[in-house]
Amino acid sequence: MAQANFGVVGMAVMGKNLALNVESRGYTVAIYNRTTSKTEEVYKEHQDKNLVLTKTLEEFVGSLEKPRRIMLMVQAGAATDATIKSLLPLLDKGDILIDGGNTHFPDTMRRNAELADSGINFIGTGVSGGEKGALLGPSMMPGGQKEAYDLVAPIFEQIAAKAPQDGKPCVAYMGANGAGHYVKMVHNGIEYGDMQLIAESYDLLKRVLGLSNAEIQAIFEEWNEGELDSYLIEITKEVLKRKDDEGEGYIVDKILDKAGNKGTGKWTSESALDLGVPLPLITESVFARYISTYKDERVKASKVLSGPAVNFSGDKKEVIEKIRKALYFSKIMSYAQGFAQLRKASEEFDWDLPYGTIAQIWRAGCIIRAEFLQNITDAFDKDSELENLLLDDYFVDITKRYQEAVRDVVSLAVQAGIPIPTFTSAISYYDSYRSENLPANLIQAQRDYFGAHTYERTDKAGIFHYDWYTED
């Protein structure tokens, strides 16, 4: 049997496509699936490729050159643990296991520590781009032992997407243990925010301005030529022009307004809460999906709860431009929050995350790829210790020029009774972050009153408690 250079466990669409991607770069790839018929199906479909068909884990491991490089593309959670448990007795010290699933970062940290005791290297790798990206080039976020990553880097750099701006591969070492999967988690949280902001923009254009799908599609097409140039804007304009293949009209109008999720947005918000990082926009985008699932209750509520009538009579062209500015402004708030979370996590877990590089490897292959990511890289190149993107000169200038549009759009939506939780959250975050003084002094006084939680003073150092129960 030919010695394979790389192995992939899991022949669902992502695993199959990654295996084919690696093979297309000149490598021989061993493939294995728990259900042998699936492995045979993939092998038969691609007999002209340098794939090694294996029917048992023993055969799979035996087919690989040492140190073995094995990528797990199985369901996150218990299935990954079970696969590792089955593989472990067959591996030698120095072998490398790569988890390319949508894994929660604490699981990656645990597995990394457990496998290190056995001398097995473990690389948790976030993979973004979906099934097409897996085949043609994803964005990849690996974390684990640096020396182990160096052994897989040549393959990863070949299979990763290449940024159109400079041809650089969209993969880089993120840091120790769970760093890669953490970065992918935040990527997914930002993705939630981007999608909700676009949805709210669409809703305003449709329900407030009364525009047709064709008109909205043309607007998104124009927006994709400027600052908002991104994959999600690109696919939105494609979605809006597609007709229903089972009837009349547009397919988007026939899709039930209940948004699903796989939990990664929730993970991002949970981690932010654990770290004490404000992440309001991304968290609102998660809640927006949740409330969308309450369809039956919303239908009932729509019949009994009153709201204002939508009666717009202004300049539509002017409002469209304000919505564009509000969308870009709010997108900046989302990324500022996400990168602030990455900074706090990096400090907490001692990862030394490369913030500018993270923005670079998101420029192609992934769902949130966007032109403005270069502005983020530039910001961190100028100041690697930048506390928040909003403090960078470029973003200071944009927010100064665009904030009025956001305030107008939020006011318009509120007066029309149109929910825009992420737009509203964006301007509130901005105003909170730029406020030298917030009313938290009153909250701290209340906490001290009922729970003797103490407080600090503005005029002198120390921790204080006031005797609230003594008459003044």
From Swiss-Prot:
UniProt-annotated catalytic positions: 184 (proton acceptor), 191 (proton donor)
Entry binding sites for NADP(+): 10-15, 33-35, 74-76, 102
Superkingdom to which the source organism belongs: Bacteria
Pathway it works in: Carbohydrate degradation; pentose phosphate pathway; D-ribulose 5-phosphate from D-glucose 6-phosphate (oxidative stage): step 3/3
Binding site for substrate: 102, 128-130, 187-188, 192, 262, 289, 447, 453
Pfam families assigned: 6PGD, NAD_binding_2
GO molecular function: NADP binding; phosphogluconate dehydrogenase (decarboxylating) activity
Family: Belongs to the 6-phosphogluconate dehydrogenase family.
Identification of the protein by name: 6-phosphogluconate dehydrogenase, decarboxylating
Organism: Lactococcus lactis subsp. lactis (strain IL1403)
